[in-house]
Each structure stands twice: as C-alpha cells, then as structure tokens.
Amino acid sequence: EDFATGIRDADAMLGKLTEYFSQVDEPVILVFWGDHYNPIDSNYDIYTRSGYASDSSADPRLHQTTLLMWSNYSDRAVDLGTIAAYDISPVMMELFGLRQPLYFQFLGRQLRAAYRANTRGTIMEKDGTTSNELTPLQQKWSDEHWLLQYDLMFGKGYALGRMGLEELAEDAE
C-alpha cells in the first residue's frame, strides 16, 4: 500500500508541476528520476519471482530506473535508452540545446564512443548488453574519465591537453 500510494502521489504532483510550468513564459526543464528501484520487500523478491530480474542483487535491471525530462518549450519525445546517473545532466543539456561545460562535453563524447554506463564494475554496452570487462577502447575512456575528474577536483588542468580538449577549454573562457 505504501509503494502504490507513493506512485499515485508522485504522479499527481508531476501533473500539478507540468500544468503550472506549462503556463510560465520562461523556459523550464523538469527532470524526474529515482536513483534505485524500491525493493518493496526483502531481496527484491517481487522482481525475481516475476521473472523481471535474476536472483542476484547485481542484476543491472535492479539498478535501472525510469527517467522523465519535461520542458515547457519542447514537445519532442526521445527514448534515451540506458544512461548512467552521471550522464543525466549532459544529456538533458544536449537535448535542450544548452551550452555544456567541458566536463559534460567529455561525458557526451564518452557516451557516444565507449559505453552507455560504467558503474560499480558493470558496463552497459552501446547495444544494451552488459559486461564486467572493459574493452581496450572502453578502458582508455574510463582512464581518461578518472583523470579528468581528478584533475578538475585536485589538479592543475593537465588532463585537458592530454585528452586533446584544449579547444574546449578555450571556448569555455
């Protein structure tokens, strides 16, 4: 009952928000997303007994959630497929034609070139299959991702030149 009530209330609030913001003159983008499935019971039993997922908590389907992006200035429907949580903002900015910071541009390139997601040792391939091992190309992108994150948080900008993204850094100035 609690889960169903939560779904009903979230749906009602989504309706109120979109109704309100559809009347606003300024551009608005709303992003609705949950970071995990509700286990409903212990060990995700309802998902495994229904055949939706395997009996392993590592099953990628148990870690995918629905994502909804809504805007009051675009009614284009897009199926995003599976993307990592860290790609939500870059994908949203690209879809709605917003200027992206360097880091988001890198994530967009990685999403198109290497994999749909790389989280906790599980790789979601571009074709939707999963793997636990990175290809050499994926390893290169993963290493560059780590290097860029480290450099942006603690470094002095060394990663920008190494990744061939100097022109993006100049555009951001």
What are these regions (language model features)?
Residues 1-173:
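Solvent-exposed soluble domains appended to multi-pass membrane proteins
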